[in-house]
């Protein structure tokens, strides 16, 4: 049992460095996003120090890695409690934390300070070519390191579940985590045929974010809702199974909407369009799930900020992944919209709503306990955190709207006219500068919201110190 009265098991404390490091990487991701926002307007900004392609690579890689740290931290916190036993090996968890953190930092530094071709040569890409593909730019050694970390992580949490109590939350969480690791193995398959390459590339990208990651999100949300509402576990688990079934049925065959224009058989035009229309359903179910559970709550949990994050993530995920995804998922529409700023609008709101917000939901609930503060931080800290929530969420919604408007104009000028009348790509970009300024403004406000959110931890730190002093006098 734990010496910290607010966590059940001592080994749950290993979640803390994972969640803290996730937030540090999140800050880095936003800073590089702002660099890109300026570069869309002033193309030579920070050139040649940080070219646009490098800034984008760092921005997207930091997104992936900080979310993985968040998922791992959440797993290390909730799985021991759900399994009703200590984590199998806290020492292994801490060892893997340092391996993953050091490898991640070195990879980002490699992107920034070593020419990409030189980095590929240094890391053995000629022996097993895996680099150069969007989102999978990591050197071979980094990819292999990710596999090692995933295997060690799955062994650790898997043994905890096998030796402990099995719950729906544990089973769904483990299914999502195993799927995450298995799908990543396709990152090592890089065929010369471009159609085949793209076909399997989407196994990693789509089946992560619109497949197994949804399972992880649903398990994390269910766990937090049980804790903050006091609703019967059986009720929440029934909802969880329905959401998981919807996510898998729609998500797996929904991969087809990425196969429209890569040279795949025409059957994917139908399969992708039909099943992609079902993909908003699990996110809509999460909205109903969260609000229904909060309305049926049996207790007033003192952590109001965690409740706000829990409800906010479902609504924003439904808007970003559901509504904005559906807007351009049908093949006749996607013919004009794919690869435009409308795609970027969908990606930003979906990732923020579904995955960034669920990690921050979990941090909001778990961090006061991990820091021995109590069920919730003081009222000032919660008010500050909720200000951060609203600033980040509203600015992201406006950023999405501005990118959507840019996408519509881009389609109107570049895609719809016949070849002779259509503007070229760069000429079209010149017509979108106003929207890029508005997007940059939204990004700056988002950063302000993130800073406000992080400042709430200073308030918590004072409460933490007070708790430690009180414990010392006891």
Task: Describe these PLM feature segments.
Residues 3-53:
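N-terminal regions that are enriched for targeting/export leaders
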Residues 1-3, 150-162, 191-195, 216-231, ...:
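Juxtamembrane interface elements at the cytosolic ends of transmembrane helices
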Residues 15-25, 88-101, 169-179, 230-250, ...:
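Interfacial and helix-entry/exit segments of alpha-helical transmembrane bundles
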Residues 61-75, 141-156, 209-224, 277-291, ...:
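Hydrophobic cores of alpha-helical transmembrane segments in multi-pass inner/ER membrane proteins
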Residues 1-16, 371-379, 409-433, 460-474:
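Extramembrane terminal tails and long inter-domain/linker segments of multi-pass membrane proteins
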Residues 49-64, 202-210, 265-276, 307, ...:
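Transmembrane alpha-helix entry/boundary detector in multi-pass membrane proteins
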Residues 34-41, 47, 54-161, 186-192, ...:
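Membrane-interface helix-loop-helix modules in multi-pass inner-membrane proteins
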Residues 201, 205, 218-335, 343:
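Membrane-embedded translocation segments of transport machinery
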């Amino acid at each position: 049992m734990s010496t910290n009265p607010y966590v059940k098991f001592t080994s749950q404390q290993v979640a803390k460095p994972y969640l803290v490091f996730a937030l540090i990487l999140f800050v880095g991701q936003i800073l590089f996003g702002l660099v890109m926002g300026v570069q869309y307007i002033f193309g030579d900004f920070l050139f040649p120090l940080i070219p646009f392609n490098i800034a984008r690579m760092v921005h997207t890689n930091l997104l992936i890695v900080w979310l993985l740290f968040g998922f791992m931290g959440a797993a290390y916190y909730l799985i021991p409690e759900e399994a009703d036993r200590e984590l199998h090996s806290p020492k292994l968890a801490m060892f893997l934390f340092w391996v993953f953190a050091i490898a991640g930092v070195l990879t980002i530094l490699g992107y920034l300070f070593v020419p990409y071709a030189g980095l590929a040569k240094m890391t053995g890409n000629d022996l097993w070519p895996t680099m150069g593909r969007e989102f999978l730019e990591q050197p071979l050694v980094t990819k292999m390191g990710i596999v090692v970390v995933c295997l060690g992580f799955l062994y650790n949490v898997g043994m905890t579940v096998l030796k402990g109590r099995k719950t729906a939350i544990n089973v769904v969480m483990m299914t999502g985590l195993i799927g995450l690791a298995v799908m990543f193995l396709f990152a090592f398959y890089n065929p010369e045929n471009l159609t085949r390459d793209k076909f399997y590339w989407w196994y990693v990208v789509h089946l992560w974010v619109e497949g197994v990651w949804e399972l992880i999100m649903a398990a994390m949300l269910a766990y937090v809702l049980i804790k903050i509402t006091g609703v019967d576990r059986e009720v929440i688990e029934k909802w969880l199974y329905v959401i998981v079934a919807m996510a898998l049925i729609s998500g797996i065959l929904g991969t087809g909407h990425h196969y429209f224009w890569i040279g795949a058989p025409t059957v994917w035009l139908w399969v992708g369009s039909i099943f992609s229309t079902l993909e908003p359903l699990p996110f809509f179910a999460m909205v109903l799930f969260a609000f229904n559970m909060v309305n049926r709550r049996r207790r007033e949990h003192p952590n109001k900020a965690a409740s706000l994050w829990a409800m906010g993530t479902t609504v924003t995920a439904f808007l970003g992944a559901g509504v904005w995804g559906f807007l351009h998922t049908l093949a006749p529409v996607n013919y004009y919209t794919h690869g435009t700023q409308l795609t970027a609008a969908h990606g930003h709101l979906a990732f923020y709503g579904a995955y960034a917000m669920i990690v921050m939901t979990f941090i909001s609930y778990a961090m006061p306990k991990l820091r021995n503060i109590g069920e919730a931080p003081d009222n000032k800290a919660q008010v500050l955190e909720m200000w951060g929530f609203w600033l980040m969420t509203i600015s992201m919604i406006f950023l999405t709207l501005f990118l959507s408007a840019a996408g519509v104009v881009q389609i109107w000028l570049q895609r719809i006219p016949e070849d002779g009348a259509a503007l070229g790509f760069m000429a079209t970009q010149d017509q979108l500068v106003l929207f890029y300024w508005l997007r940059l403004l939204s990004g700056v406000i988002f950063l302000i919201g993130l800073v406000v959110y992080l400042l709430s931890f200073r308030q918590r730190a004072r409460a933490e110190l007070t708790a430690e002093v009180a414990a010392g006098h006891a």
